[in-house]
Amino acid sequence: MGLPWYRVHTVVLNDPGRLIAVHLMHTSLVSGWAGSMAFYELAVFDPSDPVLNPMWRQGMFVLPFMTRLGITQSWGGWTISGETAANPGVWSYEGVAAAHIVLSGLLFAASIWHWVYWDLELFRDPRTSNPALDLPKIFGIHLFLSGVLCFGFGAFHVTGIFGPGIWVSDPYGITGTVQAVAPSWDATGFDPYNPGGISAHHIAAGILGVLAGLFHLCVRPPQRLYNGLRMGNIETVLSSSIAAVFWAAFVVSGTMWYGSAATPIELFGPTRYQWDLGFFQQEIERRVQTNLSEGKSASQAWAEIPEKLAFYDYIGNNPAKGGLFRAGAMNSGDGIAVGWLGHAVFKEKQGNELFVRRMPTFFETFPVVLVDKDGVVRADVPFRRSESKYSIEQVGVSVTFYGGELDGVTFNDPATVKKYARRAQLGEIFEFDRATLQSDGVFRASPRGWFTFAHLCFALLFFFGHIWHGARTIFRDVFAGIDADLDEQVEFGAFLKLGDTSTRRQSV
């Protein structure tokens, strides 16, 4: 036929049977990719340390989505929380992956069947015997079925009535588990961090979808609207479908990047804004002050800080630090986290506590500056030692660790103090294993960053596709140079007298 690459899909334009076939094949490929990717990730995933080596540090992409829907156990005998799996059953990680592979095979077979048996009576208008699809009715059917699915997910899966529930955690990502969630029908349901809103919105949207589907099945569109929106043209379906997809892609890009109940930090990693706002740092400080007010020593107060919480307060887990063109998991950058060294407290000779100014998100290097409680600079690591006034040596800075592996240890050696001051710029200080994965020391983005980047790119492409195909279908007659409706529509008794041929325009 000699079609250019961007017009090859015209071969299924007026062929409903093979249009179904190519969509079945596409769904087969998507399902097959999901199952295959899950098996690959399970093959390389290390479940041994859910605190310092969680799935998002290992670059897992499909496992977090399975986990947030309630899958937590593996046929390999492990669970996502680090415990031993007792009886994983069918709905384990491997079971879901296998189900996708089986579904892919069935869809593949269905695609071949529809490609071979493409000329079904179902696709022909009984009055004219021409290939024809009742697109408004098909729209109603799809809307009704998707509404049932949406309602079922919110009313049964999320609530735990018939299903496991979804992943629910606290704001600091410490206590996450799969739980049944009751729908929130008041104003709190609009809080993006309230999991009850997920259930309520799916129930409400499902009911709306069912009602809208029934409406479109029962009510025919007006002729002017049918013609104006080109409802008889399959390219109209393509254009509006692309609009739905690009809108969804933009929405999930936002919920992933800014955070929401649907994208818990235990599964996808923290957001960049939690570093920018000192979210975890403030919570750690609050807990420490509470412990100190109870009469505990500094070592005891810091020892009670969960290692998981301290690890979130580290800039290497900020998805905006990774860059868009550095391939690999976070562990391929700074390495596999082995342990928390403890909280570093810096003091000058007089005993006043100093605080290292933390590196902002979009800096690769940042001057090492230590300030007092009033924000006044008291010490630094100077660029030119000959002009320095506040160097570590001159001020006599020492560092003491509380909690962690170096609990109670003090260093006075300037070289060692400088080393830990540089590392304190990056938040809490951790020991990393860079040998196992030959990590290069350059930060990588978490799956949160990759997901956002990919979906923004696809949303922009699909937005252009919506405009392109929408314009093609609405202005089809203009582009083709042919008026699709050559005969004027006549409503006798209103615009035209019966038998008056002088004012009516007719095609030749």
UniProtKB/Swiss-Prot annotation:
What keyword terms does UniProt attach to this protein? Answer: Chlorophyll, Chloroplast, Chromophore, Membrane, Photosynthesis, Photosystem II, Plastid, Thylakoid, Transmembrane, Transmembrane helix
- InterPro entries attached to this UniProt entry: PS_antenna-like, PS_II_antenna-like_sf, PSII_PsbB
List the SUPFAM superfamilies.
Photosystem II antenna protein-like
Mention one GO biological process in which this protein takes part, according to its record: photosynthetic electron transport in photosystem II
Lipid bilayer topology:
Multi-pass membrane protein
Asked whether the keyword Membrane is assigned, the reply is: yes
What would be an example GO MF term here? chlorophyll binding
Cell compartments where the protein resides = Plastid, Chloroplast thylakoid membrane
> What does the record give as the function of this protein?
One of the components of the core complex of photosystem II (PSII). It binds chlorophyll and helps catalyze the primary light-induced photochemical processes of PSII. PSII is a light-driven water:plastoquinone oxidoreductase, using light energy to abstract electrons from H(2)O, generating O(2) and a proton gradient subsequently used for ATP formation.
UniProt similarity note: Belongs to the PsbB/PsbC family. PsbB subfamily.
For this protein, the record's NCBIfam families field holds: PS_II_CP47
Protein name according to UniProt: Photosystem II CP47 reaction center protein
What organism is listed for this UniProt entry? Chlorella vulgaris (Green alga)
Instruction: Kindly list the organism's lineage.
Output: Eukaryota, Viridiplantae, Chlorophyta, core chlorophytes, Trebouxiophyceae
